[in-house]
Amino acid sequence: MGMISEFKAFAVKGNVVDMAVGIIIGAAFGKIVSSFVGDIIMPPLGILIGGVDFSDLAITLKAAEGDIPAVVLAYGKFIQTVIDFVIVAFAIFMGVKAINRLKREEAVAPSAPPTPTPQETLLTEIRDLLKSQNQNRLP
């Protein structure tokens, strides 16, 4: 029973739940970016370049023979994937930059130090009195 309770404690920690939410949102965001690049950015870019469909760009290394498919380097899909990556990396960079800015603003306004308790005040006074007595005794 101890292992189950340990797993439960681990699974409901804030960091684990936050990580799971981040992974799910990241996967959904990746799909959105892929659609954005493939369906919105690449077609106009292909027209500007001269009517090129990037998904069809490939180099055939060996033609298909019978049931054996062709060996192809699909560099157009690779270009599209690189553009996906650049957009995702930029979005993550902007998100991290915004979070860091918020953290810096919090750090600029530190909270006031807590006021000492009556016991701490009394101990401080006793310490100061002892220091002054010791200084008076030294030649």
UniProtKB/Swiss-Prot annotation:
It is a multi-pass membrane protein. The chain crosses the membrane at residues 9-29, 79-99. Its main location: membrane. Pfam families: MscL (PF01741). One of its GO terms (cellular component) is plasma membrane. One of its GO terms (molecular function) is mechanosensitive monoatomic ion channel activity. Keywords: Cell inner membrane, Cell membrane, Ion channel, Ion transport, Membrane, Transmembrane, Transmembrane helix, Transport. It is found in: Cell inner membrane. It comes from the Bacteria. Channel that opens in response to stretch forces in the membrane lipid bilayer. May participate in the regulation of osmotic pressure changes within the cell. Homopentamer. PANTHER family: LARGE-CONDUCTANCE MECHANOSENSITIVE CHANNEL, MECHANOSENSITIVE CHANNEL MSCL. Belongs to the MscL family. This is Large-conductance mechanosensitive channel. It comes from Pseudomonas putida (strain W619). The gene is mscL.
